[in-house]
Structure formats: C-alpha cells, structure tokens
C-alpha cells in the first residue's frame, strides 16, 4: 500500500447535489423548495424561535434573576495544588500564573481547602477560606491577604 493508492471507503463520500440544473436531474424547476410561499423565496424563512405569530416560549416563561454588574470572579486554587512548591516558597499570584496553576488571575486568587497541604509556604492571595487559612498555618506556613 502506497500513499497514492489510498482511496476512501466506498459509500463514505458523496458528491454534492446541485439543484436547479434542469428537469432531467430530478432537482430542477423549484429545486426542492416546493411551490411559492415564504420558504421558497431567496432569503426566505423565519428566525430561530419564531412560532408563527404565537407568543414564543421565551416570552411565555417568566424572567428570573439578574446579572450583578460588579460581581467578582476569583481564580480558585486548592491546597493540594500548592504541594508542588518547595518548602519556604513565597506563593504569589504572579508565581501561580507563571507555573501554570491558574491561566489568569481574573479578579484575584482565592485559596480553598481542597486536599491536604504538606509543605510550609508563605501564601499571598486576595481571599482565603477559613479552613484553608487554618490548614496553611497548621503546616507552619503564613497567610497574607493582598
């Protein structure tokens, strides 16, 4: 078998069906669009969600909630991911981005107590959960809110 001898499996490839190319093709005259009407015209058709004038579903259902314009979204870091750093390291948001722990700092870094911390670290972040703060201090490290 050589590269120039490769062929697709029979039946796996289909030629495009060109419509409006004469009556003998079976797809001439109306080109599969039926007779007249909105859907037969060029650019015809209704927008997605249109229900023929009936009040559409998205308008029948009630509105819920609101979007807080001042919402802060924190990049989350778990304690077990901090184990990759050597003891005595000062863990900063810049270091976390540099090492690929978080892709971006978003509105800040929040440390959560998922997993167990075995190394003594100085952790600088914008927020800490109570349990994370206790776990870092129990491991002999220090917590700094920036």
UniProtKB/Swiss-Prot annotation:
Disulfide bonds: none
Any single biological process term in GO: translation
Chain residue ranges for the region called Disordered: 1-69
UniProt cross-references to Pfam families, sorted A to Z: Ribosomal_L27A
Keyword presence, Endoplasmic reticulum: no
Taxonomic path: Bacteria, Bacillati, Bacillota, Bacilli, Bacillales
Self-association state and partner proteins as the record states: Part of the 50S ribosomal subunit.
Chain intervals with Basic and acidic residues compositional bias: 1-18
Family designation: Belongs to the universal ribosomal protein uL15 family.
Gene Ontology MF terms: rRNA binding; structural constituent of ribosome
Protein's name in the database: Large ribosomal subunit protein uL15
Native organism: Exiguobacterium sp. (strain ATCC BAA-1283 / AT1b)
Job of this protein: Binds to the 23S rRNA.
One of the record's GO cellular component terms: cytosolic large ribosomal subunit
Compositional bias (Gly residues): 42-52
Keywords, ordered alphabetically: Ribonucleoprotein, Ribosomal protein, RNA-binding, rRNA-binding
HAMAP family (UniProt xref): Ribosomal_uL15
